[in-house]
Amino acid sequence: MRGRGNARSLLVQAVSLRPATWHPCLDMGHLHRPSSRTSHRNLPHVFLLFLFVGPFNCLASYSRATELLYSLNEGLPAGVLIGSLAEDLRLLPRASGRQNQQLLHPERTASEGNPPLSFSLASGGLSGQYVTLNNRSGELHTSAQEIDREALCLDGGGGAAWAGSTSIASSPSSDSCLLLLDVLVLPQEYFRFVKVKIAIRDINDNAPQFPISEISVWVPENSPVNTRLAIEHPAVDPDVGINGVQTYRLLDYHGMFTLDVEENENGERTPYLIVMGALDRETQDQYVSIIIAEDGGSPPLLGSATLTIGISDINDNCPLFIDSQINVTVYGNATVGTPVATVQAVDRDLGTNAQITYSYSQKVPQETKDLFHLDEVTGVIKLSSKIGGSVLQTHKLTILANGPGCIPAVITALVSIIKVVFRPPEIVPRYIANEVDGVVYLKELEPVNTPIAFFTIRDPEGKYKINCFLDGEGPFRLAPYKPYNNEYLLETTKPMDYEVQSFYEIAVVAWNSEGFHVKRIIKVQLLDDNDNAPVFLQPLIELTIEENNAPNAFLTKLYATDADSGEMGRVSYFLGPDAPSYFSLDSVTGILTVSTQLDREEKEKYRYTVRAVDCGTPPRESVATVALTVLDKNDNSPRFINKDFSFFVPENFPGYGEIGVISVTDADAGRNGWVALSVMNQSDIFVIDTGKGMLRAKVSLDREQQSSYTLWVEAVDGGEPALSSTTKITILLLDINDNPPLVLFPQSNMSYLLVLPSTLPGSPVTEVYAVDKDTGMNAVIAYSIIGRRGPRPESFRIDPKTGNITLEEALLQTDYGLHRLLVKVSDHGYPEPLHSTVMVNLFVNDTVSNESYIESLLRKEPEINIEEKEPQISIEPTHRKVESMSCMPTLVALSVISLGSITLVTGMGIYICLRKGKKHHREDDNLEVQIPLKGKIDLCMRERKPVDISNI
């Protein structure tokens, strides 16, 4: 089958194509024949099968039942191609009804004019919601209804829900999720019933989620190290496979716990809490952390919940008395039921493990037990009978505090009975503040001098002077109330703070002049007020996170305390108005997360406020500042300022001179943004300074050897792994006038050319041909004759632009002989033009009869006066008038021409041959030799290698 892409580059592929089932009415010659052994063994079964299905199958003799399986990702947009039934069933367009003939002879069936194929779903059902079928082409596409695998399969509980021609099927033991369709291929001639199965592949579009936001786990305090406890309510992820929950972790282990994950045979992962240290409930009874579930998608998605680990109590503590002995005084006239003392033991355990009962020791006499009643629950000792005259004055009460499974704690109470012959003073309170069961309730921050109660002091005997004072510590004062001498007012002396001390116990003591006194205990309970705002542990919360973080990445857990109690001390957390929208803060747990990927190059630092608000009325709040720094990752390649660079450099530029700066930047920071430059090609010629980006040439560059260079420069950053980019650099060499013209013809100062006396004025005689390796004006050449030698050398002139030498005047009898022209070839270079010279030898005669004579003349040093006249090149051609000569030379010339016509024709033939020979010499690749004349002119002989001048 063919793979098909989609708009999000998700593979949609038909993974299998089952062959058509065998039909008994098809041509047996084209069927696969089983082996003889198999056919003999299964012959009865095959025969029975023929008898049963043959009649039904023959009703549609050419039908074929076929099954196709495709797969695609969930969440694809509308119009994504799933598969082509016509292609995958190998059905040709406009095929005939006989499929065997169609497949074997398509050219024969195409001409029969059979009706075209058509495809249709067996019935409507749910197919229109998820897929569309093209009735002509047989192409299946996704519809506008987006396919959600979790909604299709997980909601079905692993079964199948059929609706017409479409159904959804899933297996609870696997990750398969199938969309089933029945497709009919018509017309009847090649009818097929096709079962199409579309496997819906899962993508990571769901984050793990815990069923509850707060999970509680109870661990006995005597649990040994490595104890494992399963955490109930594990996270649920509707995705399957690697996209499901893969692992768990704790945000804060407290050094006491860790997590392990176990996978059962069904692939379900359960987190286990493992005890890593010794626990003591009495030291710390609770640990709070954040449990995070993470799936295996890319990028992974996270879910979190608050994990509260409670330490359950065991009976590892016994009751304990703070004191070993107490001393109590009882007046002899005390009434029955008067409290004598209270014993109280402490057990640090909880619940039934801390249940304490009090009892007398067996050493306590029964008479004492009858006199003093001990409450076994509260430990209160009361006078149970009236004190008689014969009662002992001192009683020793040995009291036991009993705990479950413990040795009793022991305390001794020594009770001294004071015989009284008169009645003690009386203290009668009248409460102003709210009082319930002997406890006075005051609001904190009540103003100074807040009245609490009036106390009236009475002397039953009426004959003693009674004094009164306040016993105990606290911001209270007991002062006489002025209008009445025997009344006192209890009031506050300064504002009280619940958070400093919430409970006070004081006593009003009255005594008479005989030394007898009585106490009245006053208990004061402060009521908390919302007078404290939450306080962050740090006013500035500095955080860091690497860029390109996963979505919903954890940043920190905010924590603020409130000294108030109850709801007034419960703190909620909120983002400030200046916080970007992609930051989120859990109001209950204080967990701060970022929902999107951060890019350091877009923004490196974030600074915003967070609020901690209590639940008091009115609520109080405090503000902290979050300073988040995004750490850099090497996610940006170096970037050149220009796509490519071009530099113009004069030739002969000195080695290691500065050609130009290659500017490159890297948006990353630190080492990730450090860029090193290097030349990838021609590094033997060029080098680049990494620090400055300066490009230099190691050697001097000659334009005539190479006019331009193309370099590739690579920029590599210092990240791990390193990122790089390249750019193209073009270096164009600018020409300077460093090459004089090179004379190619004539090739030697010793060569000569025969000029016939019959040559007409204005006729070309020869030429000087030179080239210059420079360019532009440096290569524009001008020709001039700067020296002449011969009978009448001024008879010849040279074209300053072309170098053509022509005869100016008709040759006379006196002009016979050797004419020597010193030609200067100059360029137009700036600032100093360069030049070369060449000697042009012209021998005027009818024939060359003695070459040795001519060569001897050429070997003599000519005495030539140098003319310093510069050649003038004009755009328009110039013409010189040929001055009229005397009649005699003209007549002689005409006579010679008329008498020597044959000689003239012969001379012209020789001239033509010489011209062809010159062209041949120009094309020769031998060494070109320029031989200057010796003599007064300071010339030298130079040899040059042949130069290709085809472009001149």
Swiss-Prot record:
Record GO cellular component, one term: plasma membrane
UniProt main location, coarse: membrane
SMART domains reported for this sequence: CA
Residue ranges constituting the Cadherin domain according to the UniProt record: 64-210, 211-321, 322-536, 537-640, 641-743, 747-864
Range of residues in the leader sequence: 1-60
Residues in the Cytoplasmic compartment per record: 913-952
Keyword Repeat: yes
GO BP term, example: homophilic cell adhesion via plasma membrane adhesion molecules
Pfam families: Cadherin
Protein name according to UniProt: Protocadherin-20
Organism, as annotated: Mus musculus
Source lineage: Eukaryota, Metazoa, Chordata, Craniata, Vertebrata
